[in-house]
Curated annotation (Swiss-Prot):
GO cellular component, one term: ribonucleoprotein complex
Region (Disordered), start-end ranges: 1-44
Pfam families membership: Ribosomal_L34
Name recorded for this polypeptide: Large ribosomal subunit protein bL34
Gene3D superfamilies referenced in this protein's UniProt entry, alphabetically: 1.10.287.3980
Similarity comment: Belongs to the bacterial ribosomal protein bL34 family.
InterPro entries: Ribosomal_bL34, Ribosomal_bL34_CS
Lineage, top ranks: Bacteria, Bacillati, Bacillota, Bacilli, Lactobacillales
Molecular function terms from GO: structural constituent of ribosome
Domain of life: Bacteria
Organism: Enterococcus faecalis (strain ATCC 700802 / V583)
Length: 44
């Protein structure tokens, strides 16, 4: 059986990237909560 995580930079950005987060209201909420928490990295 192959492993479930098959790294792919492009897909990672397309699904979890900053621009993807900014493109929806809930995505912006995610960024806001991560900023509020003080995360060093706010998106992939």
């Amino acid at each position: 059986m192959k492993r479930t995580y098959q790294p792919n930079k492009r897909k990672r950005q397309k699904v979890h990237g900053f621009r993807k987060r900014m493109s929806t209201k809930n995505g912006r909420r995610v960024l806001a909560s991560r900023r509020r928490k003080g995360r060093k990295v706010i998106s992939a």
